[in-house]
Amino acid sequence: MAAVGSMRSGSPAFGLGHLLTLAILALASDACKEVVLQVPSELPAEKFVGRVNLMDCLKSADIVHLSDPDFQVLEDGSVYTTSSVVLSSGQRSFTIWLFSTDSQEEREISVHLEGPVEVLNKRPHTEKVLSRAKRRWAPIPCSMLENSLGPFPLFLQQIQSDTAQNYTIYYSIRGPGVDKEPLNLFYVERDTGNLYCTGRVDREQYESFELTAFATTPDGYTPEYPLPLLIKIEDENDNYPIFTQKLYSFTVQENSRIGSIVGEVCATDLDEPDTMHTRLRYSILEQSPSPPMLFTMHPSTGVITTTSAQLDRELIDKYQLLIKVQDMDGQYFGLHTTAKCIITIEDVNDNLPTFTRTTYVTSVEENTVNVEILRLTVQDKDLVNSPNWRANYTILKGNENGNFKIVTDPKTNEGILCVIKPLDYEERQQVTLQIGVVNEAPYTREASSKSPMSTATVTVTVTNQDEGPECIPPMQTVRIQENVPVGTRNDGYKAYDPETRSSSGIRYRKLSDPRGWVTVNEDSGSITIFRALDREAETVRNGIYNITVLALDADGRSCTGTLGIILEDVNDNGPFIPKQTVVICKATMSSAEIVAVDLDDPVNGPPFDFSLESSDSEVQRMWRLTRINDTAARLSYQNDPSFGSYAVPIRVTDRLGLSSVTTLNVLVCDCITESDCTLRSGERTGYADVRLGPWAILAILLGIALLFCILFTLVCSVSRASKQQKILPDDLAQQNLIVSNTEAPGDDKVYSTNGLTTQTMGASGQTAFTTMGTGVKSGGQETIEMVKGGQQTLDSRRGAGYHHHTLDPCRGGHVEVDNYRHTYSEWYNFIQPRLGDKVQFCHTDDNQKLAQDYVLTYNYEGKGSAAGSVGCCSDLQEEDGLEFLDHLEPKFRTLAEVCAKR
């Protein structure tokens, strides 16, 4: 019972494990079931047959065998023929064994190949009802090999509905390949449900077709739902892998380590991804130049790496590789293409520059500068005109004085040795230089360990030159005491012949002497005092007076030197107070500090002694001096002085007793600071001497002169204005605008044509108006007689727009005023002949027209009668017009417009 109970209690777990095992076995058996492949009756070698699912059957399988040697299976389950196969009986079968060494499991898959079966389009006629197994109206797996050779139409499969047992069913399909692009590629027999393909299909264009199958009765009834039907196009290895570039270019440095990456190539395949058809393998077919092979390519990634560290650009600077890519994981029957790859070896500085010669000999003349004396050549195997090839030269030894310089010729890479500082034959006849050379780019570690820097020795011979005198040292000095007597001789400048080291035959000449104090002896170069020497002069700096001397030899060669005359000081300058005016602000201070200076050397200067230099007892009583230090003293007042200016004489004496008196102007002010100093008015100025300076006097005189000029200008202006008043009487019609456009009849009075108003001016300036006789006024001219012979003439001619006034004063003065542009002579020449003609015509006609010799009254002017003029002198036939009125000045044109408006 216990055993039974035990078995019963464990039976549920045992049953669950048993069911799980059965499920796994069922799935495995379903994955390892028989596979039926539709193939042509003839298969060529290396032809793709189909694909079986190896991973689902036995995932850990590592050994695969086939029972038929005419076929082979790849890792992804693709089945290929190894030789030509003919299905003589229309079918062929073989078995694939799978074995896992880890789990010791074994599986097998049966593969059946079926050739094309000719299916009659005519539905078979049977008189009995066929019994068949029940079918489900469900999706049926269907596939088709791309690029199938047929024969077409190619039978794919048959679709049937379970309702065919009860109804007469018609089958139809729709979708891409039927009623959509590509049209009419598939069709189904209406009665049998057989599905056919009418032509070849390219998987790269159409990976699959999703069709919909329909089952209907003749009367249109649909007993089944539409059936989704997927037709998958099995891929065929019909596309070659293609490199992304036809020519690849890579660079790699020479002497690179093994395994250095050169570059990576890439190829693409249009076949179905993740299959053997697109599993690519890369390889190098050929290397040029020929082996040894220096490069390798990773078969899966296409990365090119180096296999040797002996890449030398100096031997071979470029390699060409022929590379290949092949699908089917590199199987011999896979498709492949090739491309070219150019690998350029990049230069590194692995070769040191070396001199072609180790010793050089050259020469240079002394005293020459900036000349090329030698070119040094080097050899470098690195890339020309690159930093690895260009040389840098250095003078290692022998150029301690900086006489030489070496530079690189950028074109030839030669070293150019130049002299930049003159050489002296008398000092050195030969110079030995050691020159080294390196590259611009740093050396690689391997190169720098091979050999040290390349060096060369250059021997430079200095040749002698007949040169001029040498002024060495260029600055020479002599010591002379100031104020020595004129004519005193002293040593001067000395130049030497560098070859003889003597001064014979050298002549001297003075080039500069700012104050003309000395003369230079032409033969010896000695100097003679020409004027008194003053150490305190402005041209003396730090007690030294410089002159420039030119030395010449017999051939005219020269040199220039400077002679510094050191002037020894004598006590010839007494101390003095430079600030001669001091301010004492009485409110804030009672003293002022005074400082004395001495132009002599300190040995002849301080300490100074300050004292009041005056016999005036008031100065001694009011002021007091107190010593502050060697050069300063304090001046303070003793009594309460008034605000003002005080002259205080002070004597300053140096240590040797030489003294001078300085009169100090002391300002005692009511101020806070010295800048605010102002003297109080009304206070006594003591005994200060206050004077006006020359500039103050000049300013006062200029002010007075300016005032007189202003007064004189005002008087002249007033006098001229009074003289110009009332030159003409107010009632003269010539100077007034009168109304002249009236045409009313005049009065019955007769006016005398000979009457003329005359203005007479007495000596006292009073003006009287009288009437002059006939002939006084002629042509609009008035004459005004004056008491003392003065005469005033007034011309007023309206016709030409011109007024002219002439005034002759009593005492010979003459004033003339022109108001307009026309001159008097032009108007006179124009009007005088016409006035003469008019006067003559009037005189000749007086006897005949006496009644018209007065103003006439015209009451009526007939229709169309020309407007005439009054008076006997009128002439209707006058030829001269009044066109000049059209060219009046602007002011008269305005007057005419005003009159016209009235």
From Swiss-Prot:
Cytoplasmic topological intervals: 716-902
SMART domains tied to this protein: CA, Cadherin_pro
Cellular component terms (Gene Ontology): adherens junction; cytoplasmic vesicle; desmosome; endoplasmic reticulum; intercalated disc; plasma membrane
Tissues expressed in: Expressed in intestinal epithelial cells (at protein level). Expressed in the heart. Expressed in tongue, bladder, stomach, liver, kidney, and lung.
Cadherin domain location: 136-243, 244-355, 356-471, 472-579, 580-694
Gene3D superfamilies: Cadherins (2.60.40.60), TCF3-CBD (Catenin binding domain) (4.10.900.10)
Prosequence residues removed at maturation: 28-135
Keyword flag Transmembrane helix: yes
UniProt GO MF annotations: calcium ion binding
Residue spans crossing the bilayer: 695-715
Range of residues in the leader sequence: 1-27
Residues modified by glycosylation: N166, N392, N546, N629
Extracellular side: 136-694
Localization annotation: Cell membrane; Cell junction, Desmosome
Phenotypic effect of disruption: In an intestinal epithelial conditional knockout model the width and length of desmosome cell-cell junctions are decreased which in turn increases intermembrane space. Significant increase in paracellular flux in the intestinal ileum. Decreases intestinal epithelium wound healing independent of cell proliferation.
Keywords: Calcium, Cell adhesion, Cell junction, Cell membrane, Cleavage on pair of basic residues, Glycoprotein, Membrane, Metal-binding, Phosphoprotein, Repeat, Signal, Transmembrane, Transmembrane helix
Domain characteristics, as noted in the entry: Calcium may be bound by the cadherin-like repeats. Three calcium ions are usually bound at the interface of each cadherin domain and rigidify the connections, imparting a strong curvature to the full-length ectodomain.
UniProt protein name: Desmocollin-2
Gene source species: Mus musculus
Phylogenetic lineage: Eukaryota, Metazoa, Chordata, Craniata, Vertebrata
Gene: Dsc2
